[in-house]
């Protein structure tokens, strides 16, 4: 796994298709463990189902890579993801930590991002409450 393959994996402009199951199986180990702030999935079938589920819940999705760092079998990819849902666009900046096995496939994939702020911030009434909570506990 090199930076060119990682950049391709983390690139999906609005209006273009997501990676196919075949493409994901070429990059991910059968026993891949995936975790993000909303879910944990074990195995390639569960990972593919999670990706398909996200695509079905959204009108469109984009993914844009930023900085990519690889050290031996660990890679970090900064990214920005946009989700369009019912006419509202949600933007999530984040980073992925990928562990690569000896066959060059991802065996562990963990995404780090703030789910609450970008999800509920744009929503009337809830957005104000979320911003109040952040100020109360973060500032």
Question: Model-found features: residue ranges?
Answer:
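Flexible interhelical turns and helix-capping residues at alpha-helix boundaries
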Residues: 14-17, 32, 36, 87
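A beta-strand edge to alpha-helix "cap/lid" segment located at domain peripheries
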Residues: 56-62, 69-139
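Soluble or luminal CAZymes and related metallo-dependent hydrolases
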Residues: 2-5, 46, 90
């Amino acid at each position: 796994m090199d930076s060119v393959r990682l950049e391709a994996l983390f690139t999906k402009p609005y209006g273009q298709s997501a990676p196919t199951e075949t493409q994901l199986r070429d990059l991910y180990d059968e026993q891949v463990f995936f975790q993000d702030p909303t879910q944990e999935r074990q195995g390639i079938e569960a990972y593919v189902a999670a990706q398909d589920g996200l695509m079905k819940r959204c009108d469109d999705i984009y993914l844009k890579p930023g900085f990519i760092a690889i050290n031996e079998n660990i890679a970090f990819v900064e990214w920005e993801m946009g989700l369009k849902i019912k006419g509202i666009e949600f933007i999530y900046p984040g980073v992925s930590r990928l562990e690569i096995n000896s066959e060059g496939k991802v065996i562990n994939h963990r995404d780090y991002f703030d789910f609450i702020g970008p999800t509920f911030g744009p929503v009337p009434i809830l957005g104000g409450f979320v911003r109040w909570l952040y100020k109360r506990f973060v500032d």
